[in-house]
Structure formats: structure tokens, C-alpha cells
């Protein structure tokens, strides 16, 4: 179902969020995915037994990745889930504007997508080990999804950056500035 909603949007879009990395195209469809995820979340039924009013057959939300923005990579780095080379840390700390689609920007965003997918898979494995009932993703694949992980991490990053919350119990690195780029895709 996510493909059915995103498809017309992507087909009718006049431009794409694409870049080149090692001789191949990289497409990041953040806006299309957010469209589906926000519609799904905004109209989510009060009871899980009720069908979704916009996606009665299921939104296939589990097919979406995280949204590859600037905030989630920041918290993933803080949590030691992704690491940055010293050269990139220097760029971030200097608040240097990255060119849209450059190697650094694509690397940060792509690493975040991969990292959140790995977090999702680890969560599914832990749920399976903990309790047979928890291993299910849900009837519509939404119990443990990259979309919900993205929502949580984005909010967590803001709270940590603003000093409203701190991470305890695990080793973290100092929270770094977000990467900066001028783009309509964020």
C-alpha cells in the first residue's frame, strides 16, 4: 500500500532527491515516505482491531525506511550506533554547509537508513527471544517499524540537544551539531 500512495507522488514529482556515489545513483525519497507515514499516523484507529480508514488493507508501513534527515543521524552518532571520521567531525563542528548530494551528505543519510534498519531487526530479534507474542510485527507490520523508530529518535535528539534529557546506562559520545545543507528535501 505504501507503494500505491508513494507511486503517484514520485511519478508526478518534477525533481528528485538524488545524488551520485561511486558511479551509481542514490535516491532518497524522504518526502514521499513522510507523506505515507504522516497519513498513517494521523488517522491511526483508536483500536488495533479497527481497520485504518485510509489503508484498510494495511499501509505496509514496515516497507518504509527511516526518513534520512539531519536530526536522526545526530542522535545515532551520540548513541555510538554510527561513527563519523575525524574529517567529518571537523566539518560538523565548523558548521560548514555541505553541498546537497555530496559524498558526505549521502554517506550520513545512507548510514542512518542502514543503522535504523539494523536497530529494527535487533528489536525484532529481542522481541522474539523475550516473548512469543511480541515477535509479531502486528497485523499490518507496524509494531516495530523504522517509521516509529525514526519518530522516537527524532524527538529524543531534540530533547538531548536541548538538555531536557540525557542518556544513561550506555557509553555515548558528545552530541555533535547536525550536518548542514541547503535543500528542499529536508
Describe every region a protein language model picked out:
Residues 1-186:
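HhH-family (HhH-GPD) DNA N-glycosylase catalytic core used in base-excision repair
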Amino acid at each position: 500500500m505504501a507503494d500505491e500512495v508513494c507511486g503517484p507522488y514520485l511519478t508526478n514529482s518534477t525533481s528528485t532527491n538524488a545524488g551520485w556515489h561511486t558511479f551509481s545513483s542514490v535516491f532518497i525519497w524522504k518526502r514521499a515516505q513522510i507523506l505515507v507515514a504522516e497519513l498513517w499516523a494521523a488517522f491511526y484507529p483508536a483500536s488495533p482491531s479497527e481497520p485504518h480508514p485510509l489503508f484498510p488493507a494495511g499501509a505496509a508501513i514496515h516497507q518504509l525506511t527511516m526518513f534520512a534527515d539531519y536530526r536522526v543521524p545526530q542522535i545515532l552518532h551520540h548513541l555510538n550506533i554510527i561513527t563519523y571520521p575525524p574529517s567529518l567531525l571537523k566539518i560538523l563542528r565548523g558548521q560548514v554547509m555541505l553541498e546537497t548530494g555530496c559524498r558526505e551528505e549521502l554517506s550520513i543519510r545512507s548510514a542512518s537508513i542502514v543503522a535504523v534498519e539494523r536497530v529494527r531487526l535487533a528489536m525484532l530479534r529481542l522481541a522474539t527471544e523475550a516473548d512469543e507474542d511480541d515477535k509479531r510485527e502486528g497485523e499490518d507490520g507496524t509494531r516495530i517499524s523504522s517509521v516509529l523508530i525514526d519518530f522516537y529518535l527524532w524527538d529524543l535528539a531534540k530533547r538531548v540537544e536541548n538538555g531536557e534529557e540525557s542518556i544513561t546506562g550506555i557509553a555515548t559520545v558528545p552530541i555533535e551539531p547536525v550536518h548542514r545543507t541547503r535543500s528542499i528535501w529536508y
